[in-house]
Amino acid sequence: MRNAVIVGYKRSPFTFARKGEMANIRPEDILSQTINQLLNEIQINKNDIEDIITGCAYPEGAQGNNIAKIVSFMTDMPEHVAGMTVNRWCGSSMQAIHDATGAIAINSGDVFLCCGVESMTFIPMNGLTYDPHPQLSKDNPNVYMSMGITAENVAKKFDISRKEQQDFAISSHSKANSARETNMLDNEIVPITNNDQIINKDGGIRPNTSHEILDGLKLAFDENGTVTAGTASPLTDGASAVIVCEEEYAKKNNLNILARIKSTCLLYTSDAADEEDSVDLGG
């Protein structure tokens, strides 16, 4: 059995969509800069790269045309290096790692670039043209459930109060701000440039978040719910890249092995026993 290992990783800063520092930077540029800086640090022969596998939830518009292959031309890859875009919604970039792990196991390559990219500025939630199937959306509207409603369903199912959500949000922002201010994230974040602008810090952190502020926010998704804009996932622009390679290749090339991927799995998002509730959590 050929083992897959991770030998390097980088990400761009994550900034607010539409109003953040990277709102006017195309997703291909964010991803290609992330890849370039990863490969500048981890010295791998580009000729050894089998495939660039890129997760993207909305592969259309600026993120369309197989963005994984598009960025190969923006990162000076040899022509034979392939590119594939995969979509498993929020798990898309993780799926890229799953695919590389499986390919390595069956001897379909030694080195893979596994990436993720999303500019929710360029491609908004629900894509450029939202067009659900008329009959399916009528018969089973949960198929098209949004992440906001998913959050509400999780809160209801596991009895997570608004206060508990706000406690977690405040703690999360505080920890993230502490990490940012003490430069603990600098080893994983690469600076993204846009003309004379350099973005090298996460932009979605609100260190002054408090219960007083969060208490004043309106409910975002359900008038009888608990989730607000202050406790929901933000709309974000960003990219990431990981080098996954075969273990013996890593050792032969003196690469620092950070992790070994022993197995992968897919997990259904509902633990409901009866069929009526089987899609109540969303995905």
Feature locations, PLM:
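N-terminal extracellular/periplasmic Venus flytrap/periplasmic-binding protein-like
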Residues: 10-13, 24-33, 41, 164-252, ...
